[in-house]
Structure formats: C-alpha cells, structure tokens
Amino acid sequence: MVLTGVTSKAIRKGGAEPPLAAGAFRVYNMRFCPWAERAMLYVAAKGIDAEVINVNVTDKPEWYLKKHPLGKAPAIEHDGKVVIESLFIPEYLDDAFPENRILPTDPYEKVQQKLLVDQLNAVGGAAHLLFTVMRDRTLKDEKQVKVFEVLKMAEDLLKDEFFGGSKAGYADYLSFPFFEKIWWATALQVVDLPESSFPGLENYPKLTRWFDKMIHSDVVQSVTQSLEHGSAFMNAYATHQELDYDLGLDD
C-alpha cells in the first residue's frame, strides 16, 4: 500500500487541479476532518495505492466544487467516477476492491457492523460537545458528564479486541476518528480524561486497550495527525480562529 501526498499542502481557491493519471485512484482529504479520516483509514486498511489531494474546504478551489457540490471532504475519484460521503465510500471500496473486503459479506454480520457504527455515532456527538467547552469553559462539568456516559456506552459495546472482532473492521475504522477527537480535546483540558492510556484504564479498560492498538497501528499512523497539531486545529475551529490547513507541515 502506497499513499502519496498525505502531507501535501492543501489546495485552495485559485489552485490548479492536479492532473490525474489514467487508472489512478485519488482521495480528496482534509487532514483534520474525522469524516475524511474515515475514508483515509479505509483506503489504507484495504492496501489501495492512492494519491491524496488535501483540500482547503474553507477557501475551496473552484474545480473541486464540480466533484463535490458542497466542497466538503472526503471524496474519492476512481475510473472517472467521483464518490462522496464517508458512509458510502467504504462500501464502494469493498465492492470495487473485493479481494480485501472489510465489511462482512454475511448479511447478518454486515448489519451488525452497521448497527455498531450507528450506535457509535454518539461518540461524534460527544466530541462536538467539547467544542462548546472550548468556547465557554464554565460548561465543562455539564458537558463532560455526557461524554463520560457515551464512553461507557462504547465500553459496553466492545465485546472483543475490536468492534470488528479479533481484528479492526468496518466499525473500528468508521468510529475511531471521533474517539481520536475526544483524545485531542484532552490536551486542551476541556475534559477530565488522560492523554496517555486514553480514555482511562480504571473506567474504560476495554476501550483503553482498543484505542492503544488502533492509534499505534500502521493503518492509523499512515494517515493521522499528532495530538499537538490535532488539538491546536480543533481549538482554532471551535473558537472561530483562522484555520491553518497546513498546520504541522512546516515543522
């Protein structure tokens, strides 16, 4: 698996569309977006050779709006076709590249993985609550109680090493980016959870072991951002500061 362009600068309005070679596979990405990270993780997990184009989704390049009407990330381009939306891209990838499927083919098991993703969407909602705390620290106690409740729910849903069973699967790759955003928030002191051994062995032992396996996996390491840069971008977004889509690339 070769992902090229993961650390490329984000293209903004006025930037030219990079030519796409015949037969090439491309991912349009935003480095700090959890929905875009879903697609990136899935591509990496399937071992697809892909060119990554990072896009400034605030000051969008004109040509990108022809690929995604809202100018959001992610999108993929393959065989002259563009597929958008982080829930649809994984299934497309499994159908287009069936030799290394992640979503089960068994109808019942497939539904179970989709149900898990649906239940774990609450983690994204919990992460969003922490944006409000970044804007108003007096809300911390109120909001973090709800975050703890969601993490306990996720702890109870984790019946094996991974949500996908004995190895990372569909539900793991689609939910991980939102757990990661709560982890980023720990660096901003807006939630009382540990940075190391996140989210905490005492209260969430299964989830803590799961997160450790995921964050140190080759798949995640190939696409993720550091805690330092992720938390800085998250804080800038929450507090309506100017966003640096290339944060960390000059270090």
Protein language model annotation of sequence segments:
Residues M1-K167, H240-D251:
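GST-like domain detector, emphasizing the conserved glutathione-binding G-site
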Residues W35, I84, F88, S175-F179, ...:
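Tryptophan-centric aromatic hotspots in well-structured domains and transmembrane helices
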Residues R38, L115, Q119, M153, ...:
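Alpha-helical scaffold segments in carbohydrate-active enzymes
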Residues L103, S197-F198:
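Membrane interface segments of multi-pass transport proteins and intramembrane proteases
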Residues E161, W183-V190, V220-T224:
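Substrate-binding/catalytic groove segments of enzymes
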Residues S166-V191, G200-N203:
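GST superfamily/GST-like fold recognition
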Residues E202-S231:
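A contiguous, mid-protein "functional segment" used to position or interact
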Residues L227-D244:
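C-terminal/domain-terminus segments
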